[in-house]
């Protein structure tokens, strides 16, 4: 998802800014590194067209929270994971990147400083120790995390943060030696912290990687080599791309998302041996399609994943209004489509110590009517199939 600052509520912005900038006085801000998981058997795996979590094979629901790793109040993090656990949501996708070109002077959390041709990983209390606590809390609450390493969009730095530090272009990121060396060094720094944690559902190459106007071989080669590198560092966890699902002949109606103009070939990329499952997103209002069109998008990706012999994760989907009416049919379609083994709505909202968590327009909050429709009732539908 590309964040739209104009849609963030004032309350959500205040909450996010306070959480990331202000140190908390209580002892709850101590940030322990996550301890290694107890049993190797609890690592997430795949079985045919399904995910296997904690020994259970089937369909799993979850959400996205780009902001949780930037909170400085541990109680807020624990509150979110407690509510996820209570609701039956099993997977949370979080931003594993926070790239800056200048070190913040206000105490804001950042993970990775890119400046003047150099890259420095921030392992301090205002850096990856915040992600440490997210992983630790996820372990305690039985939630699985998808952690990605860079953003195609400019939110929290993204690829353009690398471009500003090393030169070149956004499209050139995938083949530029200096940028790729910094990117891989960051991947290694993150994976080395959590390679033994069973809280990790999967490592994800990027949020919505695109290469507009490029031959599809550019992204393919980058995905292949990067996923191989990740597997060389950690063979225990799944690896995925984080793409939107663009570039697909199966079920194509010729509309923009099915085309190859963003440099992506969904089926070809999915066939890479070191990619364990497919990811796809759905934002009709951003893509010039209708809400009803989304159901065909879901089934087309299910068919492509079935052909590849790998499960699909419906990884992001959202609208800015009528959440229940619009998103419920997508959930039902995904739940009843072979090879789709989970969905994560965009995005989770909760009441934090500083106010509501950020609302980019697609957010709905814990305990609301939309939450009952799209989480409580959805989990009940999933459980009724078991």
UniProtKB/Swiss-Prot annotation:
It is found in: Secreted. It comes from the Eukaryota. Residues 1-21 form the signal peptide. InterPro entries: Glyco_hydro_5 (IPR001547), Glycoside_hydrolase_SF (IPR017853), MAN-like (IPR045053). Substrate binds at residues 95, 207, 283, 346. Gene3D superfamilies: Glycosidases. Its EC number is 3.2.1.78. One of its GO terms (cellular component) is extracellular region. GO terms for biological process: mannan catabolic process. Keywords: Carbohydrate metabolism, Glycoprotein, Glycosidase, Hydrolase, Secreted, Signal. SUPFAM superfamilies: (Trans)glycosidases (SSF51445). GO terms for molecular function: mannan endo-1,4-beta-mannosidase activity. Pfam families: Cellulase. The active site is at 208 (proton donor), 316 (nucleophile). The keyword Hydrolase applies. Glycans are attached at residue 336. It catalyses: Random hydrolysis of (1->4)-beta-D-mannosidic linkages in mannans, galactomannans and glucomannans. PANTHER family: MANNAN ENDO-1,4-BETA-MANNOSIDASE 1, PTHR31451. Endo-1,4-mannanase, a crucial enzyme for depolymerization of seed galactomannans and wood galactoglucomannans. Belongs to the glycosyl hydrolase 5 (cellulase A) family. This is Probable mannan endo-1,4-beta-mannosidase A.
